[in-house]
């Protein structure tokens, strides 16, 4: 009896295992069928959307073309950017105006340079020649009035101007003598032979005269 019960239990367990395997296989099959149906439905929706909106594909191709061209889209005079024909014309006009503005300045500089070139340069040889001529006149004439008048005519100075300079030189010399201290030879300061027997504070006869 016990052997029959155990065999019955084993057969029942085997049947249960077979049923479970068949159920698992059936479930996997149903899952595969559902997945295929879901994917087919999704593809159909994508195709319908693409047919319903034909502009999206064109926009996508245009976007790809812009990316390939480095991000530059439409071209023309109205489009802002360095490639537009309007900007090119404006750039050429601006450059032409700048050149016109710079042309007068260049002409002025050229005229100044030409004037500088035309001005005669003073050479040291001419000055030395004049000095030699003046020295020759002074040596030949001495202190005569004719020689002085000749020198005045040579350096184009009138007698009034010469007298004015003479007065100014005399006044300058007089004021300079007054400003300089007059040296006093005293017995205590220096051994002057004329002041050896003189008393303290007696003025030396060789001192410069006071004014």
From Swiss-Prot:
GO terms for molecular function: DNA binding; DNA-binding transcription activator activity, RNA polymerase II-specific. Residues 119-176 bind DNA. GO terms for cellular component: nucleus. It comes from the Eukaryota. Residues 52-62, 70-84 have a biased composition (Gly residues). It is found in: Nucleus. Residues 38-129 are annotated as: Disordered. Residues 102-119 have a biased composition (Basic and acidic residues). Coiled coil: none annotated. One of its GO terms (biological process) is regulation of transcription by RNA polymerase II. The keyword Nucleotide-binding does not apply. Keywords: Differentiation, DNA-binding, Homeobox, Nucleus, Transcription, Transcription regulation. Highly expressed in placenta. Lower levels in testis, epididymis, ovary and skeletal muscle. Transcription factor required for differentiation of embryonic stem cells (ESCs) into primordial germ cells. PANTHER family: HOMEOBOX PROTEIN RHOX5, MCG113260-RELATED-RELATED. This is Homeobox protein Rhox5. It comes from Rattus norvegicus.
């Amino acid at each position: 009896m016990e052997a029959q019960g155990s065999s019955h239990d084993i057969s029942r367990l085997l049947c249960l295992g077979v049923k479970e395997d068949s159920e698992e296989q059936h479930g996997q099959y149903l899952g595969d069928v559902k997945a295929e149906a879901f994917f087919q439905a999704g593809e159909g929706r994508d195709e319908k959307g693409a047919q319903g909106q034909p502009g999206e594909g064109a926009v996508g191709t245009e976007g790809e073309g812009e990316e390939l061209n480095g991000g530059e889209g439409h071209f023309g005079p109205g489009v802002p950017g360095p490639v537009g024909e309007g900007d090119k014309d404006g750039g050429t006009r601006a450059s032409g105006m700048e050149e016109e503005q710079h042309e007068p300045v260049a002409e002025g500089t050229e005229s100044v340079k030409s004037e500088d070139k035309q001005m005669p340069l003073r050479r040291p040889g001419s000055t030395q020649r004049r000095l030699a001529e003046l020295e020759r006149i002074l040596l030949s004439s001495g202190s005569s009035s004719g020689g002085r008048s000749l020198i005045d005519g040579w350096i184009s100075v009138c007698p009034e101007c010469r007298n004015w300079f003479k007065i100014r030189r005399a006044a300058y010399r007089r004021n300079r003598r007054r400003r300089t201290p007059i040296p006093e030879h005293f017995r205590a300061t220096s051994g002057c032979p004329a002041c050896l027997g003189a008393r303290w504070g007696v003025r030396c006869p060789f001192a410069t005269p006071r004014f």
